[in-house]
């Protein structure tokens, strides 16, 4: 088990202590640092900055949105960052949702699984640099020969040579079909709101992908990077209460009423009625009431909270469930140091 630092995206500006957090993560033996994007700051530029200030931490996107860039442009980012960082880059990709894809990027959200498969295939072709890139799929045809084409496009391969032709690609996935696809075509799964209580169910989804012809990985060499809030405290009830507004936001505000992939995660955990109530209250603007409706048990399913012994026990449970890296958010250097100290022996350190 390893620890990664999740620094997310800017809301609305980068935290002023971010350089200190990254330096502490490197000093305290964290394995990686990840950046995200939504509809503001991008996921790649901060990694270039942090990479210049570190020498060991792996640098990942969790996640870069497919619709933000063509596959070739995304591969160029990956190729460049991996070279600049000395082979430390991890490309984490995700489809986002229709509100962002259609509302922000102005693209249709249709067939997200098929688009993901094509996208990853093109990125791997670019990074392999074995031949000019060709894709006959409907979503990202290369060369483009559709409406408006001049007919002058030709297959190309990058003029810059990649440091690694096999930069790790991980996928953010929540539903069973997407998780199975991730196991088939990716090097790891970026899991959000993972609960060890459903480890057997996740294993079924993953095994479906591993069993497909041409699957890239198997269970033994596949990474599961689970985003997780860890709070070391003697006030367990207080920490649980503090987490509820965040969960209410994801359940009610990070998707449409009829299509919210985050809400579906919690329904599959066994909270369908509560999720419906939380979503309705949140969309009506009754956010405090929505947070109050979040069950304690739901928070405990997806959060690691308690004293050092309780935290170590929960981390061990997640490791038994298949998690290889816990991706945690930290508000300050002291929290980075506390997690490092508490989890020595449970988390693999590279000091």
Which residue stretches match the model-derived regions?
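Active-site-adjacent structural elements that line small-molecule/cofactor binding pockets in enzymes
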Residues: 1-351
């Amino acid at each position: 088990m390893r620890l990664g630092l999740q620094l997310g995206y800017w809301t609305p500006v980068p935290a002023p202590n971010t350089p200190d957090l990254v330096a502490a993560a490197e000093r305290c033996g964290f394995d990686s640092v990840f950046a995200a994007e939504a509809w503001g700051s991008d996921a790649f530029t901060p990694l270039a900055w942090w990479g210049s200030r570190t020498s060991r931490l792996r640098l990942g996107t969790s996640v870069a949105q497919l619709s933000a860039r063509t596959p070739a442009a995304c591969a160029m980012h990956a190729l460049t960052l991996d070279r600049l960082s000395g082979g430390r880059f991890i490309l984490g990709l995700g489809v986002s949702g229709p509100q962002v894809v259609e509302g922000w990027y102005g693209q249709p959200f249709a067939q997200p699984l098929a688009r993901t498969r094509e996208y990853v295939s093109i990125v791997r072709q670019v990074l392999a640099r074995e031949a000019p890139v060709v894709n006959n799929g409907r979503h990202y045809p290369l060369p483009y020969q559709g409406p408006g084409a001049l007919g002058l496009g030709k297959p190309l391969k990058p003029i810059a040579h990649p440091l690694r032709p096999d930069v790790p690609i991980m996928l953010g996935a929540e539903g069973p079909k997407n998780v199975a696809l991730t196991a088939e075509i990716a090097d790891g799964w970026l899991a959000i709101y993972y609960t060890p209580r459903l480890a057997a169910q996740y294993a079924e989804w993953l095994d479906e992908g591993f069993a497909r012809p041409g699957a890239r990985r198997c269970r033994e060499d596949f990474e599961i990077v689970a985003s997780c809030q860890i709070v070391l405290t003697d006030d367990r009830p207080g920490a649980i209460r503090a987490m509820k507004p965040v969960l209410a936001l994801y359940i009610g505000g990070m998707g449409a009423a009829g299509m919210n992939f985050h809400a579906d995660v919690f329904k599959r955990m066994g909270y369908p009625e509560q999720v419906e109530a939380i979503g309705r209250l949140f969309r009506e603007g009754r956010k405090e009431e929505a947070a109050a409706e979040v069950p304690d048990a739901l928070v405990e399913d997806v959060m690691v909270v308690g004293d050092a012994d309780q935290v170590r026990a929960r981390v061990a449970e997640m490791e038994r469930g298949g998690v290889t890296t816990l991706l945690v958010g930290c508000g300050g250097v002291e929290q980075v140091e506390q997690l490092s100290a508490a989890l020595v022996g449970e988390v693999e350190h590279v000091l």
